[in-house]
Design a protein with these regions (language model features):
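Catalytic or ion-translocation cores adjacent to nucleophile or general acid/base/metal-coordination motifs
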Residues: 1-46
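Flexible, glycine-rich loop/tail regions that form catalytic "lids" or insertion modules at the edges
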Residues: 48-316
Length: 316
């Protein structure tokens, strides 16, 4: 069986948007022994501030570039991009020791590690990819990991909104030939056999026609993780689709957010648009060839076979 340890001693996160409602435990973790970068400073009491923390920017503020400003006046000015000026950089960060977190697991520092039941990939996609789906098996899950891609955000250098491939959501950390990396995943699946973790893909960032996020995210992501846990426990069934297993109606707990995530919105979040997925197939073939093979990499045959099978299922 696969076991895991966390080699990190703490957490880091993007500050803007983090508040007591969106991520209570993350905010609680920053109350002591925390490093902040590129946030705003409230000069009156020497505390930090960022957009989304609350609706009261400090009047006596130092914005992230170091200028002393009246925060309320500063954030009311529309910048060159047509949006209000920001006191904190959009990608400003905090990093805090794990022991600060109120809900840190007692197993966090277990030297024996903890058993892994699920591996969850995730990209940032405005369309195409549903809220959550499960692979058919380990090899299919490895293909899903190889196909992870995201529209760029403020966290990446370059234009925002451009699709970038991010295999396993680990591109900056894959330190050797990516084909060998994928082959290692496939080999691990053979070793683990029926004890291999189930593999899932999530997308918290699907948007509606007006460009608004349809899923509330943050703490409500636990609702999707709850479905994943139940799938691992074998207590619920799932709907088989061309791309993998999707939740059945009623299996994601929406209690308390029914007004925000209506049945119609959930249908959109879980919709598999075959036309968009066929475009995804073409892009994956281009990516495998131009970005990997043509640059000296190699693609395991099992992944090409998975791509072919996906195309066949979409064409049925």
């Amino acid at each position: 069986r696969l076991y895991a340890i966390n080699p990190e001693n703490g957490f880091f996160g993007v500050a803007p948007g983090t508040n007591a409602k969106s991520n209570y435990n993350a905010l609680a973790s920053t109350m002591k022994n925390t490093i902040f970068t590129n946030v705003a400073l409230n000069n009156a009491d020497n505390t930090v501030w960022w957009e989304g923390l609350d609706k009261n920017p400090p009047e006596d503020a130092t914005e992230w570039k170091g200028a002393k400003v009246n925060g309320k006046e500063y954030t009311s000015v529309i910048g060159a991009d047509g949006k209000p000026q920001k006191l904190a950089h959009p990608n400003s960060r905090f990093t805090a020791p794990a022991v600060n977190c109120p809900c840190v697991s007692p197993e966090f520092n277990n030297p024996n590690g903890v058993p892994v039941s699920a591996i969850i990939f995730g990209g940032r996609r405005a369309s195409t990819t549903p809220l959550v789906y499960q692979s058919f098996d380990w090899t299919h899950g490895t293909y899903i990991g190889s196909a992870v891609s995201s529209e760029t955000t403020a966290a990446a250098v370059g234009a925002v909104g451009v699709l970038r491939h991010d295999p396993m959501a680990m591109k900056p950390f894959i330190g050797y030939n990516v084909g060998d990396y994928w082959a290692h995943w496939l080999e691990m699946g053979e070793k683990l056999g029926d004890k291999a973790p189930k593999i899932f893909n999530v997308n918290w960032f699907k948007q509606d026609e007006e460009g608004h996020f349809m899923w509330p995210g943050f703490g409500d992501n636990m609702r999707v993780l709850d479905w994943i846990i139940k799938r691992c426990e074998g207590t619920i069934d799932a709907e088989e689709t061309a791309i993998g297993y999707l939740p059945k109606k009623g299996d994601i707990n929406l209690e308390g957010i029914e007004d925000e995530v209506t049945p119609e919105i959930l249908d959109k979040l879980l919709y598999v648009d075959k036309d968009l997925w066929k475009k995804e197939i073409a892009e994956m073939r281009r990516y495998y060839k131009e970005d990997i093979s043509d640059k000296g990499g190699h693609i395991p045959a099992a992944l090409i076979a998975q791509l072919d099978k996906l195309e066949e299922r979409l064409n049925k």
